Design a protein with these regions (language model features):
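Glycoside hydrolase catalytic-domain context in secreted enzymes
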Residues: 1-363
């Protein structure tokens, strides 16, 4: 069915499926109605999301439902310890259960895709996003990241309460120089493969649906334009069949990194390397029609990207069940969820023993 839909699309509709807009974007409903949008993020009002899905399904030409994304990192309404804290529990089963609770609560608000797990190896405490990761150890990060994927996605993506997971940020984001966000990361290939890529391979083996490219550059090449990462490692070596989304404005930032001359070149570079969906910015909508007309980006390349996006929508069961009925899911913040969050907090506590007076404490 996904192939049939791709064959029926205009070029503009294909680019629309590759575009994601913020929930408060101007003209959002018109974009959905015109088939110029495949996904929204950061909208959590279930009535608004059901209306957007209604417009997509009933008023757009091809009736393709929307992916609805959100950062569901350590709980949704019921809040669990930060992933760094959860890692201190050393308990994959607990972490899988926490992710499952978060998925069910998010699904009750109309969300069907989380931008998690964040599985960057983090070894520099100066970096501001260290709290989102399970930490510094590649084995622990791999095991716990895979547990989160299983918790979010459940036994089947089409099950009520399951949402698609996204492994981020691919790759090396936690190793940025000086702990400065968006900075360069210089990582030898041996260390890259044995440390920083291991959690991502574990997430892939656990069945993660999507990957998110990093803001940062790796050894001088930004992730959103990095042939080695996206094509060689992820697609060719690992055989990933899902789709890749950019991080927020990361395609536009190819020019900020000095990798491309302008927005037009950035759009072509990201599309040709295999960034299937653009988050927030509009470079694909603004420039891909001309780039395809000029032969700088092949329409067959876009066909494969759109196919991967549609395949996930089909696996999620969105064509059969585009709307959300919160009554079919457990009530957020219920007693069972709150008890699990309390248990997770207690099991994440770490007791420090001041043996031999190593810590400079008087008592």
């Amino acid at each position: 069915r996904a192939r049939d839909l791709v064959a029926a699309m205009t070029l503009e509709e294909k680019i629309g499926q590759m575009s994601q807009a913020n929930g408060g974007a101007e003209g959002l409903r018109e974009m959905v109605r015109d088939g110029r949008l495949g996904s929204v993020l950061n909208e959590v009002n279930v009535d608004e999301l059901n209306e957007l899905q209604r417009i997509a399904v009933e008023e757009s030409r091809l009736g393709i439902p929307l992916l609805v994304g959100r950062d569901v990192i350590h709980g949704f309404k019921t809040i669990f310890p930060i992933p760094l804290g959860q890692a201190a529990s050393w308990d994959p089963e607990l972490i899988e259960q926490a992710a499952s609770v978060a998925a069910r609560e998010a699904a009750a608000s109309g969300i069907n895709w989380t931008f998690a797990p964040m599985i960057d190896i983090t070894r520099d405490p100066r970096w501001g996003r260290i709290a989102e990761s399970p930490g510094e150890d590649p084995h622990l990060c791999s095991v716990l990241g895979a547990a989160m994927v299983r918790g979010f996605q459940g036994e089947r993506l089409s099950d009520t309460g399951s949402i698609a997971a996204c492994a981020k940020h691919f790759a090396g984001y936690g190793a940025v120089e000086g702990g400065l966000d968006y900075n360069t990361a210089n990582i030898p290939e041996n260390e890259l493969r044995n440390v920083y890529l291991r959690p991502f391979k574990a997430a892939l083996d656990a069945g993660v649906s999507t990957f998110m490219s990093s803001f940062s550059d790796l050894n001088g090449v930004p992730a959103a334009g990095n042939q080695f990462l996206i094509q060689q490692v992820l697609r060719e070596e690992w055989g990933f069949q899902g789709f890749v989304v950019s991080d927020w404005d990361a395609i536009r930032e190819l020019t900020v990194h000095g990798f491309t001359e302008d927005d037009r070149e950035a759009a072509g570079a990201a599309a040709n390397v295999g960034i299937d969906m653009e988050m927030a910015s509009t470079l694909y909508r603004d420039h891909l029609p001309d780039l395809v007309a000029e032969g700088r980006v092949g329409e067959s390349t876009l066909d494969e990207m759109v196919y991967r996006i549609l395949r996930l929508k089909l696996r999620l069961g969105l064509f059969e069940r585009p709307y959300t009925d919160p009554g079919h899911l457990p009530r957020p913040l219920n007693a069972e969820h709150l008890q699990l969050a309390r248990d997770a907090a207690l099991r994440s506590c770490v007791l420090l023993k001041n043996d031999d007076g190593i810590l400079p404490l008087s008592r």
